[in-house]
Amino acid sequence: MTELHLWLRHEPRTTERRTPVVPSDARRLVENGVTLTVEESPQRIFPIEEYEAVGARVAPAGSWVSAPRNTVILGLKELPDEPKELTHRHIFFGHAYKGQPGASDLLRRFGAGGGALLDLEYLVDENGRRLAAFGFWAGYLGAALAVLQHRGRLVAPLTPTSKEELDKTLQPAAGDEEFSALVIGALGRSGRGARVAFSTAGIEPTCWDLPETQNLDRPALLTHDVLVNCVLATTPVPPFLREPDLDDPTRRLRTVSDVTCDVGSPLNVLPVYDRTTEWDDPVRQLSDRPPLDLIAIDNLPSLLPRESSTDFSAALLPQLLEFETGGAWGRCLDLFRTKSRELGIAVGEGELGHV
Ligand SMILES: NC(=O)c1ccc[n+]([C@@H]2O[C@H](COP(=O)([O-])OP(=O)(O)OC[C@H]3O[C@@H](n4cnc5c(N)ncnc54)[C@H](O)[C@@H]3O)[C@@H](O)[C@H]2O)c1
């Protein structure tokens, strides 16, 4: 019987309605002997009563700070700024290993408290393949928003919705002009999502992945009306779009949706803009000669909180059930220690179960 005590925390970011564990999977955890505490949260897409009904304990929002030390705290996005010393093991997306703003501060908080970050982005199998990710829904939404913008039907501000409602808006209407679309990174998780959304909208996109961009045919790229970029770049490659392409009078391309959102990174394949767009103002015009609109939203799956949480939770559940023995968590812990030490931060040597 596992002794794992898992604590599902409230997300401080007010627009974040997703959760890494949905009530039906909470039931499976409890049935398998996990002690599960779930914090109340005003915005989580699943009400607290659904967790309580499957045997979870309920705690106030933010009360993880005083949870017993051996509790594993589970969330998705950033922690609040306090406490300064983090004593627990935390599972979430830390964004702390690529020199991001605030990365070293976060690792120092773990170092100071003796806790550990088990970063969901690096929860991988022995071949380095991600075990739980939101990519499919990112691509689905990236393509859906591009379709709506291109058809003149994108309504701002964007608000979280359901797939059913979104799909209704994607149906082609009388008078809609046909257009061509290109998905790059089409074989990945988000690329697959983008293809499914296009299909719902009645569009058959051109699909490119690594082989098709090896000798990039930029003129061919520019003959598409809509581009959805879904690549996961790991080494620098020639950009898909450059500043001069914006002024190219022969360009057909009118709408770009950048799911990847590597803005500011040396790996950015779309270095033609300098900041992401937001739910309040999702589209920015990059050029008016001829027009080119950009959508670059870096929290797309949050727009479909129920569907994206349900898929993510289903992928995470088997890993949580193997928390004490699972090699994937051991790899997360090793990486946390390596990255902390690279910054000169002292970290403990405890086993996964007793950090
Ligand atoms: N905007 C958002 O809200 C959001 C959410 C989740 C993920 N993402 C980002 O989306 C990107 C893709 O994530 P994923 O989960 O789909 O990754 P993935 O690894 O499943 O797929 C990436 C695909 O890109 C392809 N690729 C890599 N380099 C390429 C190149 N130069 N040319 C053509 N194809 C190339 C790969 O072969 C692969 O098929 C990541 O950068 C991820 O951080 C964004």
Go through the PLM ranges and name each one.
Residues 116, 121-169, 261-355:
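Adenosine-phosphate binding glycine-rich loop
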Residues 37-59:
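N-terminal beta-loop-helix "entrance" segment that forms/cooperates
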Residues 15-20, 83-85, 100-101, 234-242, ...:
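Glycine/threonine-rich flexible loop motifs
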Residues 10, 14-41, 155-232:
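Glycine-rich phosphate/diphosphate-binding loop of Rossmann-like nucleotide-binding domains
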